[in-house]
From Swiss-Prot:
Family the UniProt entry places it in: Belongs to the UPF0502 family.
Stretch forming the signal peptide: none
UniProt name for this protein: UPF0502 protein VF_A0604
SUPFAM superfamilies the UniProt entry points to: Winged helix' DNA-binding domain
Pfam families: DUF480
InterPro entries: DUF480, WH-like_DNA-bd_sf, WH_DNA-bd_sf
HAMAP family named in the record: UPF0502
Organism: Aliivibrio fischeri (strain ATCC 700601 / ES114) (Vibrio fischeri)
Gene3D superfamilies in UniProt: Winged helix-like DNA-binding domain superfamily/Winged helix DNA-binding domain (1.10.10.10)
Length: 217
């Protein structure tokens, strides 16, 4: 599986998103693509890429035929579309649901199945979270080339997050961090809880005294 840079995967995610959500504006000009990459909504992290940054990555992806220049006729403005998957000669074939899940992971980073169900609504339909989990399990099932990885649960969270693996070991590093939370962090939480319990005990004792005084009167 080809390993992409963070900028490349942001560009691919934006092209996938805009192809589905605003087909009348697709393919995208360089200016529109840069704007999409730097959106403040539906992006994590928020970036401040320049046209030059985007164009450098676009040119690399064009050389590898992952993006094509769709400039037509006498137009002087280049327009770009992705060929990330489901192409005639490409090996990567994805369903609408699989593509939507990967698109959100490309643009927003690690997500829980519940978050993915909510955040893919403009891209495809999921009847329930179980359907999202099935898609994620399918994307992670290929032992030779898994597309996503399940991260360990964060402390206090009910659901584990999933991350894509198209940027290689970056996502693996996240998984390692999540699997080994520091003992000092756990100790701080325990101390805070013990302090809260002690405060509650004092309040209960004060209330008992107040009630006894009222009864004596």
């Amino acid at each position: 599986m080809r390993i992409f840079s963070e900028t490349e995967i942001r560009i691919i995610g934006c092209l996938i998103e805009k192809e589905i959500t605003t087909p009348e504006q697709y393919p995208l000009t360089l200016n529109a693509l840069t704007t999409a990459c730097n959106q403040k909504s539906n992006r994590d992290p928020v970036t401040s890429l320049t046209d030059s940054d985007v164009l450098d990555s676009v040119n690399t992806l064009i050389q590898e035929r992952i993006i094509t220049d769709e400039t037509r006729g006498n137009s002087r403005v280049a327009k770009y579309q992705h060929r990330f998957c489901n192409t005639e000669f490409g090996s990567l074939k994805l369903s609408k649901q699989e593509l939507a899940v990967l698109c959100v992971l490309f643009l927003r980073g690690p997500q829980t199945p519940g978050e993915l169900r909510t955040r893919t609504q403009r891209l495809c339909e999921f009847d329930n979270v179980a359907q999202v989990e099935n898609v994620l399990n399918g994307l992670s099932a290929d032992e030779h080339s898994p597309k996503v990885i399940k991260l360990a649960k964060e402390p206090g969270k009910r659901e584990a997050r999933f991350a894509h693996l198209f940027c290689g070991e970056v996502s693996q590093a996240i998984a390692t961090v999540q699997q080994a939370p520091s003992e000092s962090h756990d100790n701080e939480r325990i101390v805070a809880l013990e302090s809260d319990v002690a405060d509650l005990k004092l309040e209960v004792e004060e209330l008992k005294k107040l009630i006894n005084n009222l009864l004596d009167k």
